[in-house]
């Protein structure tokens, strides 16, 4: 499992997209950690997650976890994903 870190406030960059395509090409399970979730507010998180999913053309087997190091939002989900390794 690979953890790909993106900024939830922005669309994934070309490099983010390229890295995700590389991981999918080699069938590597991936979790997207969308950081800085505290900067946009909880009500906007689903909208930003949808943008990331669409831009990356996210596989149904992969997951996006909104995360904030400031508020610890999403920390349990990240720990759970690490535990699954």
Where are these regions (language model features)?
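Glutamate identity and glutamate-enriched acidic tracts
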Residues: 11-14, 21, 70, 76-77
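Canonical P-loop GTPase G-domain recognition
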Residues: 38-85
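Conserved catalytic network of the ASCE P-loop NTPase/AAA+ motor domain
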Residues: 22-26, 58
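Conserved Switch II/interswitch segment of TRAFAC-class P-loop GTPases
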Residues: 1-17, 27-32, 37-44
